[in-house]
Amino acid sequence: MISGLSHITLIVKDLNKTTTFLREIFNAEEIYSSGDQTFSLSKEKFFLIAGLWICIMEGDSLQEQTYNHIAFRIQSEEVDEYIERIKSLGVEIKPERPRVEGEGRSIYFYDFDNHLFELHAGTLEERLKRYHE
């Protein structure tokens, strides 16, 4: 029986650059670094973001950008603060897309390896309520 999400692994070219990205934007807590050892496919680091285990492993970047993404929930009053955090790292923020009223704002941005992230100021319940009106 599935009891929840275990972890998410992202393959990245530069572990240190991605560490800065995760810490500065998501307040990620680094809980493990393999250093020069390899226990899995390559060098790796583990982080906690809001209790979620995120693993980054050294490897080739994604060749292209897609809409596949990981979304984290933030509060609506934090949107502008997060936009500034993201911009401070030189990361491009995608233009906001049109939203259904009541859906909540989102910030979409790619990391240095073409992984798309979303910071969303809304909940599933709010979205479903709006869609059923």
Curated annotation (Swiss-Prot):
Q: Which family does it belong to?
A: Belongs to the fosfomycin resistance protein family.
Ranges for domain VOC come to 4-122
Q: Which PANTHER family match?
A: FOSFOMYCIN RESISTANCE PROTEIN FOSX, LYASE, PUTATIVE-RELATED-RELATED
Q: Under which name does UniProt file this protein?
A: Fosfomycin resistance protein FosX
Query: What are the entry keywords?
Result: Antibiotic resistance, Cytoplasm, Manganese, Metal-binding
Please report the organism this UniProt entry assigns to the protein. Listeria monocytogenes serovar 1/2a (strain ATCC BAA-679 / EGD-e)
Give the UniProt subcellular location, in the record's own words.
Cytoplasm
A GO CC term?
Answer: cytoplasm
The record places the active site at E44
Q: Name one GO biological process term.
A: response to antibiotic
| UniProt xrefs under Pfam families | Glyoxalase
Task: Provide the GO MF annotations for this entry.
Answer: metal ion binding
Residues holding Mn(2+): H7, H69, E118
Name of the coding gene: fosX
Cofactor names from the entry are: Mn(2+)
What does this chain do?
Answer: Catalyzes the hydration of fosfomycin.
Q: According to the lineage, what is the superkingdom?
A: Bacteria
Q: Which InterPro entries match?
A: Fosfomycin_Res_Enzymes (IPR051332), FosX (IPR037434), Glyas_Bleomycin-R_OHBP_Dase (IPR029068), Glyas_Fos-R_dOase_dom (IPR004360), VOC (IPR037523)
Query: Mainly localized where?
Result: cytoplasm
Assembly and partners are described as: Homodimer.
